[in-house]
């Protein structure tokens, strides 16, 4: 998760990317910031400032108003590796329309879960989905191992397989209270509530300061925060 957090922070300063999506021109733009503000924890001002960030990323190569996986990986993880399980998983969770590209609404709604004011249950749900690779509603041992290995690879760490297996053993020993060889949503929630530090990387304090980071919206804002 630390790789995800570092990458999201890097979004504020990185506008790298290389792709061509001429067939998917988007004209919606910012849309209704008040509606997005009601549906997320962002204020209207934060939504408009977040849109400035989105435009910088999505127009890095062509001004198409969209972000694809390659551009997302370059901005988020500073890598253009074709195979990155961790980066792919994070992108897939952002890409709620499952069309291989991100529009602003998806971008804003996904980042909302990392806001300091986001409900803890939203953070727990997102972190659960991150490990539920097969989307079966529970986490299997192999899925945990795949994500651990992928995360270590992204951070440049190399642990012996025996050490990794030991980490997984201890995780399941505590989390799998039903002793069925898997971790369901209820068990994951209980584990996280016992160990809140597991969610420490699900909160990005800088999102509260997004209007300071990208203040240009101030000059053309159409609505006021309530």
From Swiss-Prot:
Protein name as it appears in the record: Calcineurin B-like protein 2
Record PTM text: S-acylated in vivo by PAT10. The ratio of acylation by either palmitate or stearate between Cys-4, Cys-12 and Cys-18 is unknown.
Site (Involved in dimerization): 155
Keyword Membrane attributed: yes
GO molecular function annotation: calcium ion binding; kinase binding
Superkingdom of this protein's organism: Eukaryota
Phosphoprotein in keyword set: yes
Annotated InterPro entries: CNBL1-10 (IPR045198), EF-hand-dom_pair (IPR011992), EF_hand_dom (IPR002048)
Gene name linked to the record: CBL2
Comment field on protein domains: EF-hands 1 and 4 have been shown to bind calcium. It is not known if EF-hands 2 and 3 are capable of calcium-binding. The N-terminal 22 amino acids are necessary and sufficient for vacuolar membrane targeting.
């Amino acid at each position: 998760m630390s790789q995800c957090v570092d990458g999201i922070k890097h979004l504020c300063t990185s506008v790298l990317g290389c792709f061509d999506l001429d067939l998917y021109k988007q004209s919606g733009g910012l849309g209704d910031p008040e509606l997005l503000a009601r549906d997320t924890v962002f204020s209207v001002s934060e939504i408009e400032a977040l849109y400035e960030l989105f435009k910088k990323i999505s127009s890095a190569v062509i001004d198409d108003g969209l972000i694809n996986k390659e551009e997302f990986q370059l901005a988020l993880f500073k890598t253009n590796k074709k195979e990155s399980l961790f980066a792919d998983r994070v992108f897939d969770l952002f890409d709620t329309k499952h069309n291989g590209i991100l529009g602003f609404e998806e971008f804003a709604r996904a980042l909302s879960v990392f806001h300091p004011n986001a409900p803890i249950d939203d953070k727990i749900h997102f972190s659960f989905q991150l490990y539920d690779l097969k989307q079966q509603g529970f986490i299997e041992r192999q899925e945990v191992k795949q994500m651990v290995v992928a995360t270590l690879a992204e951070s440049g760490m190399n642990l012996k397989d025996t050490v990794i297996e030991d980490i997984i053993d201890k995780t399941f020993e505590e989390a799998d209270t039903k002793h069925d060889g898997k971790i369901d949503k209820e068990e994951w929630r209980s584990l996280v509530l016992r160990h809140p530090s597991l969610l420490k990387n699900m909160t990005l304090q800088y999102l509260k300061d997004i209007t300071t980071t990208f203040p240009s919206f101030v000059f053309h804002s159409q609505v006021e925060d309530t």
